A protein has these predicted regions:
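Electropositive, beta-rich accessory/interaction domains or terminal extensions
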Residues: 2-134, 139-141, 173, 188-210
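Short, well-ordered strand-loop elements centered on a beta-strand within folded domains, enriched
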Residues: 42-44, 168, 178
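Short, structured beta-strand/loop micro-motifs enriched in basic residues and often containing a Trp
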Residues: 106-116, 156-169
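Conserved "cap/hinge" positions at secondary-structure junctions
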Residues: 131, 178, 183-184
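A short alpha->loop->secondary-structure connector
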Residues: 145
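Short, charged, solvent-exposed linker or helix-capping segments at domain edges/interfaces
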Residues: 148-149, 178, 192-194
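Short beta-strand-turn/beta-hairpin segments enriched in glycine/proline and small hydrophobics
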Residues: 148-158
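Conserved ATP-binding/catalytic segment of the ANL
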Residues: 166, 173-176
């Protein structure tokens, strides 16, 4: 919180402190680039039976990823451009440092990653997970039109500006602890993503709401 210089008016000082504390609590949670250290890997695989809710880590630490569909046991899987989702553990740690009681899956991500800033890669970048699974980045960030259960349960949601989505080019088994490798750097486009979806996200970024 920024330093609040005292004045001769204690009521004004208290009001300034309250406003500063409120601004700190409501400012967008963002993770510094230097927070990503160590090998790039999946540390948790998370699924849910319904959309708009927290996801839970799979009990045995592995699941099946289906080509052009997503995680077999997840509600967000389907024939669309947001088949799987990623969020960095470093982002969750940033939220924890702000006082939020959150852990892997609480922001609705399928894959909690560590050691790699996926936000730094353009659309179309292809990621190899473990031995088999190949995912192409299809959307970076999202626009939330309404606050879902995740926001109210966690107290905030960082996924709109720190999460990414992908489409499954090749399925297979995925395990917590699997390495993540960048096998192809994208050119900023993804043929699977509707133009209006990207336009909505870009407009939100320009307006400063994302």
């Amino acid at each position: 919180m920024p330093q609040i210089l005292p004045t001769d008016n204690p009521i004004l000082d208290a009001a300034k402190r309250e406003l500063a504390e409120r601004a700190q609590k409501t400012a967008p949670l963002r993770t510094a680039n230097d927070a990503y250290n160590g090998p790039a890997r999946i540390i948790s695989i998370n699924t849910s039976a319904h959309k708009g809710t927290r996801k839970s880590p799979v009990a045995d630490g592995h699941d099946t990823v289906i080509e052009q569909f997503g995680l077999a046991s997840d509600a967000h899987a389907g024939h669309w451009h947001r088949q799987v989702s990623f969020l960095a553990a470093e982002s969750i740690q940033t939220a924890q440092a702000r006082g939020l009681d959150v852990n892997e899956g609480d922001f609705g991500e399928n894959f909690t990653t560590q050691g790699i800033n996926l936000l730094s890669f353009p659309l179309g970048t292809q990621l190899k997970i473990g031995n088999d699974v190949l995912v192409e980045i299809s959307q970076i960030g999202k626009v939330c039109h309404t606050r879902c259960a995740i926001y109210y349960l966690a107290g905030d949601c960082i996924f709109p500006h720190e999460g990414i989505f992908g489409v499954v080019l090749q399925g297979g088994e995925v395990h917590a602890g699997d390495d993540i490798k960048v096998v192809k750097l994208g050119d900023g486009t993804c043929s699977f993503t509707p133009a209006e979806a990207l336009q909505e996200v870009e407009q939100a970024r320009r307006e400063g709401t994302l």
